Amino acid sequence: TTLKEAPLAVSVTDSETIENARIMDLNDLQSLVPSLRVNQLQTSTNTNFIIRGFGNGANNAGIESSVGVFVDGVYRSRSAARIGDLPKLDRIEVLRGPQSTLFGKNASAGVISIVTAKPSAEKEGYAEFGYGNYNNFTGKAYYTNAIGNGGAAFSLGGGFNMRDGYAEAQPGLSDLNDRNRWNIQGQLSFEPSDKTSVRIIADYSTLDEVCCAITNFQNEGAINAVRALGGQTADANDPFAREHFANKDSVNEVDDWGISAQIDSDLGFANLTSITAYRNNDTFFDSDSDFTTLEILETVSTENKIKTFTQELRLTSKGDGPLSWMVGGFLFDENVEAVDRLDWGADTRRYIDVLAGSPALFQTIEAANGFTPGSSFFGDQHAFIDSFKQENTSYS
């Protein structure tokens, strides 16, 4: 069955098109693929993939996205595990609409399938570097070659993307919306027999960025209260301003790594495919989330640790008979640990008093309960620390 004959709405972007268009990551891909949108929300890790207007799951570590992302057949369950720069590719397929028959429960809006280049027995290598405005340095390198004379081959590739921020921070702080991303991937392929092939892939990527800037506010009561206390905010009358008024640097850190093994075997009557994978994704985010020069929300942080094991088996007919068929099984085992923290700042109580219309409101409540006025509600202290774990094991 050719792509034109397949009963699917699918867009395939080959490696040449990707290179010519300077597609660095999935955020860039939306410029080539109709009906695909990639929205970066308040952190680098909270990136939402949307197909035909549908997509969710970016802001909650306990929810998997409705747009399934697969890299070489391995499911990436969270957006933080798929926002880095792309390695050397063979193609990217975007399937629009529900794809649960072949891709499982988390593909109700569609699928993004990334297929990387396989190792080659023919020696090949390249290195490329780029420079752009805001001191944007990019680099990629790739090398592949045979191992001995037995048909085995390997490849090694990596890259970096570094750029200054373009949103102006307050004096002494780092400009926001910068880039600081690194990645490396190694592959090994060999054929233990003339009917069996094995492909092993290991990869690691890291991200450490100051993100994300808020530059536009509505002129309303909450913002007017900030200004009444002498705080500064973005200019609501200038939507194109790039000045950011937070009083500390934001932190966005992602460490993502994994290993997978794919075994393809010709059984004569059918083809058997096994894909085994383990992935580890650690993220940390902290910001001054009131986005003003006052200390209202001093700390709003999230730390996630996600460990995922998947095993897929597929038995597929060769398509040379009157009936084409496929049968398979899938195991998904995932552990999620998340810690959310919120700290009030030194200006929180003053700010709440202004919003309430009078500082006497909370002082009266404190006095009635024997507290020193100004010492209890919204003090310069922890508001909450929320820790949870989620274990998910599913079979299909």
Where do the protein language model's features map onto the residues?
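Acidic, small-polar-rich N-terminal luminal/periplasmic segments of exported/outer-membrane proteins
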Residues: T1-E122
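Outer-membrane beta-barrel domain signature
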Residues: R78-S79, F129-Y131, L173-D175, A246-V251, ...
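Soluble non-cytosolic domains of exported or imported proteins
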Residues: V12, N20-M24, Y134, L176, ...
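Outer-membrane beta-barrel domain signature, strongest for Gram-negative TonB-dependent receptors
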Residues: L173, R179-M326, F332-D340
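Outer-membrane beta-barrel translocator/receptor signature
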Residues: T47, E64-S66, R78, P87-R96, ...
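Signature of Gram-negative outer-membrane beta-barrel scaffolds
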Residues: Q170-L176, P322, M326-S396
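Extracytoplasmic loops and strand-loop junctions of Gram-negative outer membrane beta-barrel proteins
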Residues: L95, K123-Y126, A167-G172, F240-N247, ...
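Gram-negative outer-membrane beta-barrel proteins
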Residues: S120, N133-F137, N149, M162-E168, ...
